Amino acid sequence: MNLKPLDVEKYKEFATAKFKERNKHLDAAIIGELFARFGGVTSYIQRVMNVLFLKTPEQGTCTLDMVDDAINYNLNMASDTYETLLRQMPEKQRNVFIAISAEGEARSVKSGAFAKKYHLPSPSSVNSALKGLLEKDFITQEGDAYVVYDKFFDLWLKKYMK
């Protein structure tokens, strides 16, 4: 079951109040930035906000320049898990998964051009890899595009699989 994203203004009010309770200040632009980066998906925003809250000292201000560090902290904490998941994937699925991440929103993944661009086997092999990745919820289909389901896993791939 997918929940609708929260209203950005309501989340700003909530987060600002939580920071104020502990004598901390939150730059309001942070919430808008996180909503933009994570499409309003609360679980990702909350994980970053938890780190930002912990790293903001009492009487201090949480600023926009702290966001990337907080995201990287989350990526580093999950790195072993992502590495294990990637290693446990069958090779064809892993290669298709990495290709989808590289594209961001991968379209025409069953085409020969996509397979050639990412040095993948035949389009039929890509198709069977897609089925496995969809069944395991590593990817999702949004219209005519495939995307990595876990946004932190996607960011981790982009950071470490260059």
Task: Identify what each model region corresponds to.
Residues 118-135, 143:
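Short amphipathic alpha-helical interaction segments
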Residues 152-162:
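Short, amphipathic alpha-helical interaction segments positioned at domain boundaries
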Residues 40, 44-121:
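Winged-helix-like regulatory helical subdomains adjacent to P-loop NTPase cores
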Residues 1-36, 57-60:
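Helix-loop-helix "sensor" segment of P-loop NTPases
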Residues 7-8, 52, 153:
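Conserved nucleotide-binding/hydrolysis micro-motifs of P-loop NTPases
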Residues 144-151:
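Minor-groove-contacting beta-hairpin "wing" of winged helix-turn-helix DNA-binding domains
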